[in-house]
């Protein structure tokens, strides 16, 4: 059992490093500070709350490495949902299978990969969001996610009238023995198999990395 709580590691890091640079995409001038990342996560958490996403719901994520990929990942796990990262090299049939097999309710995806997928093959997905700007690319019939997205700035202002600050960071209380990620293998024998990872698994990697002189 790892002493440090996986979710609390994020919470403490954002608070302690608020003004420091956190993420920059290669070849881009835009840099997200830890505070920027925490604020983006708060927006996504508000979206999840308004859409009644529950703790333990699965949310799929596929795209090349980017700042917004990282932010989406962190937003899911710190909300208490389970992230399902999918290799961007998987073919569309494998992607459809993983999304359905994992019972993912939302999908964050790059625009290029979304163009290769078929909506009618992931019918249980309630909403699909672009990794370029988090706009809603698709919503299931009966959902009002696109309308909700238009009012998200207003809802953020209502919830945080003085702006989102370090003091507002409060993430899910989740024991390290809970599953936080389902990681699918490359599927060398048939379709991919899902490996369940707990907070202990990931906290162990983080705490070890902190001991390195990088």
Per-segment meaning from a language model:
Residues 1-22, 39:
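A short N-terminal helical cap/helix-turn-helix that marks the beginning
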Residues 2, 22-66, 70, 74, ...:
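Conserved AMP-binding/adenylate-forming core of the ANL superfamily
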Residues 18-19, 147-184, 191, 214:
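Conserved pre-ATP/AMP-binding loop-to-beta segment of ANL
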Residues 33-35, 171-172, 180-206:
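Conserved AMP-binding A3 loop
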Residues 59, 76, 107, 179, ...:
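Conserved S/T- and glycine-rich ATP-binding loop of Class I adenylate-forming
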Residues 63, 86-87, 126-136:
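Short beta-strand elements of ligand-binding domains
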Residues 74-79, 101:
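Short hydrophobic alpha-helices that are characteristic scaffold elements of the AMP-binding
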Residues 88-120, 205-214:
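Conserved ATP-dependent adenylate/AMP-binding module captured primarily in the ANL superfamily
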């Amino acid at each position: 059992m790892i002493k440090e709580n996986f979710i609390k590691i994020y919470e403490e890091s954002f608070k302690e490093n608020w003004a420091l640079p956190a993420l920059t995409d290669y070849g881009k001038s835009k840099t997200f500070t830890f505070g920027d990342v925490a604020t983006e996560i708060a927006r996504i958490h508000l979206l999840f709350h308004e859409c009644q996403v529950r703790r333990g719901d699965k949310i799929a994520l596929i795209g090349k490495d980017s700042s917004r990929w990282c932010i989406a990942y962190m937003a899911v796990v710190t909300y208490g949902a389970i992230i399902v990262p999918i290799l961007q090299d998987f073919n569309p049939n494998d992607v459809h299978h993983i999304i359905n097999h994992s019972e993912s309710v939302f999908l964050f995806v790059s625009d290029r990969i979304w163009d290769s997928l078929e909506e009618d093959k992931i019918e249980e997905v309630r909403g699909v969001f672009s990794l370029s700007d988090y706009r809603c690319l698709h919503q299931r019939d009966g959902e009002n996610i696109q309308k909700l997205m238009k009012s998200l700035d207003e809802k953020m202002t209502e919830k945080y009238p003085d702006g989102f600050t370090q003091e507002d960071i409060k993430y899910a209380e989740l024991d390290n023995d809970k599953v936080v990620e389902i990681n699918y293998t490359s599927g060398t024998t048939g379709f991919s198999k899902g490996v369940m990872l707990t907070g202990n698994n990931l906290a162990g990697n983080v705490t070890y990395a902190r001991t390195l002189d990088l």
